[in-house]
Amino acid sequence: MAVSEMSVADKSAGPYGIATGPEGALWLTFAHSGRIARLTLDGELDAYSLEPPGCRPTVIAPGPDGALWFTRSQDHRIGRITVDGETESFPVPTPDSGPFGITAGPDGAMWFTEMNTDRIGRITRGGEITEFVLPCTGAYPSAITAGPDGALWFTLNQANAIGRITVHGDIVIHPLPTPSAAPVGITSDGSALWFVEIAAGQIGRISVDGAVEEFPLPDRAAKPHAIVAVSTGDCWFTAWGSNSIGRITGSGKIAEYSLPSPSSEPHGITQGPDGALWAALETGGVARIEP
């Protein structure tokens, strides 16, 4: 297993989210400096400044329109950037919403979470936003992904649950067995949903009918944060507490790989166009893991 790192910014920039674009490059959010960066596989980097710099771009995801969409958690907007670097943004109707997770839905729209206001949002290519109120308060909806069942699935960090919403807005909440697990990242492997429990040091799996399994990490203080599936029963995750990248199989077998630089704060993770795993390091770099 080869693990390497590349510097993409100084420590004040805060690389956070990462996604693979439709043109074969990697796209990152620089949460602390208000920029979106494009990184090619040969190391060429372009950075695009956002206004205001304190907008805090957070999670980024490819859209069905060939652009990248991202949340701006500090100024409560949804951003869009083309592969040529042209940006625009749209305000979330509910004030102080704190958008965080974002993903392409099965309906041609982007779906996102509102951490501060217990809502799930939907935005069209033209910027029209619809919001759906969750049946719980103080839930802190975090990451969101499209499920294999045509619905959207999301973590409720403070409600200790996984939520499901259909494209029509019907919502079901599935409580987790472990108290105060604080789920964050979530991904679909095409069969089930996998998620991380940052406070419990576990990886979870939930079937589309709501059956939950949990797998403890060797280091329960590992603080798993983001997770991505590369195939059915093969997921990779970041663990910033243990400064590592982990892998879990469908049977729950876990392997962890230490990052070269200490305390590098890995957050977002994606499968790159080269088949490797790429993680954003908040201290200013990206890590590449060749399986």
Q: How should these model regions be labeled?
A:
Residues 1-12:
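A short helix->beta-strand "capping" segment at the edge of beta-propeller domains
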Residues 10-23, 53-64, 94-107, 136-149, ...:
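Beta-rich, blade/repeat-based domains predominating
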Residues 25, 44, 67, 86, ...:
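Generic structural signal for coil-to-beta-strand starts
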Residues 28-32, 68-74, 110-116, 152-158, ...:
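Conserved beta-strand positions in repeat-built beta-propeller and related beta-rich domains
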Residues 35-37, 76-79, 118-121, 161-163, ...:
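A short loop-to-beta-strand structural motif that recurs across blades of beta-propeller domains
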Residues 40-43, 82-85, 123-128, 165-170, ...:
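Short loop/turn segments that connect beta-strands within beta-propeller blades
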Residues 111-118, 125-173:
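Solenoidal tandem-repeat scaffolds enriched in leucines and small polar residues
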Residues 157-164, 170-232:
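Eukaryotic tandem repeat interaction scaffolds
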